[in-house]
Amino acid sequence: DAAFNGHNHAYERSHAVRGDAVDPTGTIYITVSPSGAAMDGNTGDWFTAATYADWADWGDLDAVAVWVLVTVDGATASARTMSLSDGVVDEFDL
């Protein structure tokens, strides 16, 4: 499973998490919101997957503007996170 949200002004992706532990059968949490307003990066005091090191799989510490392209083919899905300046910055399977 995957859960996408977009309130924090940074890009971050967790490992698959179930309950309070990393678990390959769990949900991947993706925040896709670094564009438009000022970007935060992953340095705040608030709790997010990227600030909890055991859960973080990828975080945008440089606060680059990105979008995510999700490709679904039958029962499989993959995602590529892209930026205008850097091209592909993250790739993962769902």
Regions found by a protein language model. Give the residues of each.
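Metal-dependent phosphoesterase/phosphodiesterase active-site architecture
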Residues: 1-2, 8-94
